[in-house]
Amino acid sequence: MTAPLSLFVTGTDTEIGKTFVSAAMLHGFARHGLRAAALKPVAAGAYERDGVWRNEDADQLDAAANVVLPPELRTPFLLKAPAAPHIVAAQEGVTLDIDTIVASHREALTRADVVVVEGVGGFRVPLTDTQDTADLAVALGLPVVLVVGVRLGCISHALLTADAITARGLRIAGWVANHVDPAMSYADENVATIRDWLAREHRAPLLGRIAHLRPAIPESAAAMLDIAALVDTLRRAQH
């Protein structure tokens, strides 16, 4: 029996399409014949519907997954205010416990062939006074997919984030160029620069370029990703 696959999705910043790309990957994995589930361990920003607190990012992931996890497993920490998690957690009397997230991930792996774990914000977002999302990624021990929001400044953001990931002993399984600014000048040259630097310094392949889609449909974006290459990388990482 093939061991389940998993990856940790992070980004160069907040609001650069990390959830959108995660949803696209979920669709891609499903098309690849895999049972794909999503974990959004920490979500900040909730709304109430029918007496249940929900999160838009988590909803988008559920819509893309062909294995939908129970909400309390998919998102063990749902915070109400849309702000920095450690600040909101302190105000709401919640402790963002990494061990709880690791346990949720372990359970999720028993229910799917591949589990996409989406982080919150960028790679180093505080969860407590002493731990951040980089510590979470290390505790999970997963290959990382880096989502780069292609806009002015993205080269430095991408290289710095990649350095931070590998400095923690983690492998970058690949990166995705997500074109968030359709009016950006020299977008092709920016992507080419990031591609060359990340390949040379981190052996991190470009998994795909996602055009600025309107409407933003994850199913369409899935066709722009090299899911087969990602699956091969994840399987090799298990050995």
From Swiss-Prot:
Q: Where in the cell is it found?
A: Cytoplasm
Q: GO:BP terms for this protein? A: biotin biosynthetic process
Q: Which residues form the active site?
A: K40
Gene Ontology CC terms: cytosol
Keyword ATP-binding on this protein? yes
What this protein needs as a cofactor is: Mg(2+)
Q: What is this protein called?
A: ATP-dependent dethiobiotin synthetase BioD
Q: Which organism is it from?
A: Burkholderia ambifaria (strain MC40-6)
